Regions:
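Short, Gly/Pro- and small/polar-rich lid/capping loops
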Residues: 1-38
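Conserved beta-strand/loop scaffold segments within soluble protein domains that form the structured core
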Residues: 4-5, 37-166
Length: 166
């Protein structure tokens, strides 16, 4: 029997509205048979005209993809992640915006009925750094989002916009 581990999402630094049970989500996730879809690692310098496009498709019952993008000082990059899955897909995206750099992450969910998508976005903004997260949730299935962005300098900023079909 495959080992299942618990994944905790949306862990708040201080419990609020605990009686509504919105402080965190606990998911069972099978690590033993998880298919590693590999990693994408990029370091960007300058202002990129072409976005980095990533088509991420789940394989098998459980699969995982890791993405790590660093925008070097005074750089700008747009990343477009399109998710597709029939079963369970975990996408872990790590972003680093160096001094006065901007990262725009656009996530488009296009998963199937009965699927489960977990999108975990972590990031760090240095002085004047900015991360923008735009999510379009138009597919089917269950979607879990977990975002944690550290603002580590003067003028560092984060903005998020999410749109979904109910």
């Amino acid at each position: 029997m495959a080992e299942k581990k618990q994944m905790i999402l949306n862990r708040l630094p201080a419990p609020t509205w605990n009686w509504l049970r919105v402080n965190r989500t606990v998911l069972d996730w099978e690590n033993e048979n998880e298919i590693d879809l590999g990693a994408v690692v990029r370091s960007v310098q300058g202002k990129e005209n072409e976005p980095l496009r990533l088509e991420i498709r789940g394989e098998g019952e459980y699969s995982r993809k890791d993405v790590d993008v660093t925008a070097e000082p005074d750089s700008a990059v747009t990343i477009i992640e399109t998710f597709g899955a029939e079963q369970n897909l975990l996408v872990r995206t790590h972003l680093t915006a160096r001094r006065n750099a901007t990262i725009r992450l656009v996530q488009i969910q296009n998963t199937q009925e009965g699927s489960r998508l977990v999108s975990a976005v972590e990031g760090e903004c240095e002085e004047g750094g900015r991360i923008e997260l735009y999510q379009v949730l138009a597919g089917k299935g269950d979607v879990y989002g977990d975002s944690k962005i550290e603002l580590n300098g003067d003028g560092a900023s984060f903005e998020a916009e999410t749109g979904y079909l109910a």
